[in-house]
Amino acid sequence: MTEPNPNKQEVELNRTSLYWGLLLIFVLAILFSSYIFN
């Protein structure tokens, strides 16, 4: 019953989606701040 591959793939998928979400929030924060300060 020890199969680390599917769990590892799920963790990597969640990690990459988390990184894309943080990158998207970071870009939106930069655009929003530049829109306010201009």
UniProtKB/Swiss-Prot annotation:
The chain crosses the membrane at residues 17-37. One of its GO terms (biological process) is photosynthesis. It is a single-pass membrane protein. The keyword Transferase does not apply. InterPro entries: PSII_PsbL, PSII_PsbL_sf. Coiled coil: none annotated. Keywords: Chloroplast, Membrane, Photosynthesis, Photosystem II, Plastid, Reaction center, Thylakoid, Transmembrane, Transmembrane helix. GO terms for cellular component: chloroplast thylakoid membrane; photosystem II reaction center. It comes from the Eukaryota. It is found in: Plastid, Chloroplast thylakoid membrane. Belongs to the PsbL family. One of the components of the core complex of photosystem II (PSII). PSII is a light-driven water:plastoquinone oxidoreductase that uses light energy to abstract electrons from H(2)O, generating O(2) and a proton gradient subsequently used for ATP formation. It consists of a core antenna complex that captures photons, and an electron transfer chain that converts photonic excitation into a charge separation. This subunit is found at the monomer-monomer interface and is required for correct PSII assembly and/or dimerization. PSII is composed of 1 copy each of membrane proteins PsbA, PsbB, PsbC, PsbD, PsbE, PsbF, PsbH, PsbI, PsbJ, PsbK, PsbL, PsbM, PsbT, PsbX, PsbY, PsbZ, Psb30/Ycf12, at least 3 peripheral proteins of the oxygen-evolving complex and a large number of cofactors. It forms dimeric complexes. This is Photosystem II reaction center protein L. It comes from Mesostigma viride.
